[in-house]
Amino acid sequence: MSKSLQAIRGMNDILPEQTPLWRYFESTVARLLDNYGYKQIRMPIVEFTELFKRSIGEVTDIVEKEMYTFEDRNGDSLTLRPEGTAACVRAVLEHGLTGGGQPQKLWYIGPMFRHERPQKGRYRQFHQIGLEVFNLDGPDIDAELIVLTWRLWGVLGIRDAVKLELNSLGTSESRGRYRVALVEYLSAHLDKLDEDSQRRLKTNPLRVLDTKNADTQAVLVNAPKMADYLDDESRTHFEGLKARLDAAGIPYVINPKLVRGLDYYSKTVFEWVTEKLGAQGTVCAGGRYDGLVEQMGGKPTTGVGFAMGIERLILLLETLEQVPEEISRQVDVYLCAFGEAAELAALALSEKVRDQLPNLRLQINAGAGSFKSQFKKADKSGALYALILGEDELAQQVIGFKPLRGQGEQQNIAFDALAAHLATCVVQG
């Protein structure tokens, strides 16, 4: 017997009962980004593998272990994008969007792919909303990105469940000096490091700071701190960011071990984390990458951005019971019609109502059925009200209006007054 077809492990279907919450989240973010002057860009989900090797770094876990890479019929090595920044930078360069030093504030949404071990809040296909800003190099734009997310958390009702962590990685020069000091310190404690950290010490020493191993964490307590190696420019930038966050009343903590998992970051890095989701606590993260555009073949261009994980934020909304009640309801009004003449009239009447109330979610019963069966479907739909049209109502040019979720008797409404009545009861609440 052949194996039944099913989704690939770690790549999940988003079912009809889940999509209203996704649409609510996505539209809430999109409105906020419009208000802040960000423009949407859409990139392919497949890029040349070399793009990610050059941007993310060949000795990162993502490139070494996690990318979905394949060879196409032309012999080109292609990769499903594991993150969005590199693809966005490629698009900006290819289409000359930052020519002449022109600032760009962009955002994107879509699936990303990493071959990780699936668990709650971590998937092999996951969705992100990302923001990228080019040709603005001051701490003010770093602050705007963080202020924007703080406002979003307020709109979503999750501010009390998230915490902002900050660090500065400095310039490549200061980071190089720090790397030398860190390697010297860790090498003196090599026997106390876990196996993965010993490997990282040789390939990407700063990533040792991100270890989850308790023994290695104990070694890191007395390790050199990046803050002691910052150049004046990076220190001034970081102080400017903190001053703006203080002025905006946004609480934060300095995490000297925050380094991020991608090689292109410099100066500011930040993460929004929560303790409500277990091990997968990072819901939004980003930072500055002033050298990335030049590294990818462009002219020197500053950049800063972040990405938020949609699955994790939706999981957080559900965990905190911050899902608006109306999100779970996909139908406002359910129209039941009995008899062929009534069915024809119901179709015409419903379209007239839609003309006048374009935001009304009106569903007509399909498949005929008895009064009992149609009314059962009306109740199961979650609609607030049922409309009832039979031969008697049709003869009088009225339609029955019955509340399904609260008190109230059924009443008859004239055809020409139906839209106004629904506007009062449903659209206006």
UniProtKB/Swiss-Prot annotation:
Keyword NAD applies: no
Keyword field contains ATP-binding: yes
EC numbers on record: 6.1.1.21
Cellular compartment(s): Cytoplasm
EC supergroup of this enzyme: ligase
One GO BP annotation of this record: histidyl-tRNA aminoacylation
GO MF terms, alphabetically ordered: ATP binding; histidine-tRNA ligase activity
Main location: cytoplasm
Keywords: Aminoacyl-tRNA synthetase, ATP-binding, Cytoplasm, Ligase, Nucleotide-binding, Protein biosynthesis
Cross-referenced PROSITE patterns: AA_TRNA_LIGASE_II (PS50862)
Record's catalysed reaction(s): tRNA(His) + L-histidine + ATP = L-histidyl-tRNA(His) + AMP + diphosphate + H(+)
Domain of life: Bacteria
Cited Pfam families: HGTP_anticodon, tRNA-synt_His
Membership in a protein family: Belongs to the class-II aminoacyl-tRNA synthetase family.
Quaternary context: Homodimer.
PANTHER family noted in UniProt: HISTIDINE--TRNA LIGASE, MITOCHONDRIAL-RELATED, HISTIDYL-TRNA SYNTHETASE
Protein name in the entry: Histidine--tRNA ligase
Organism: Pseudomonas fluorescens (strain SBW25)
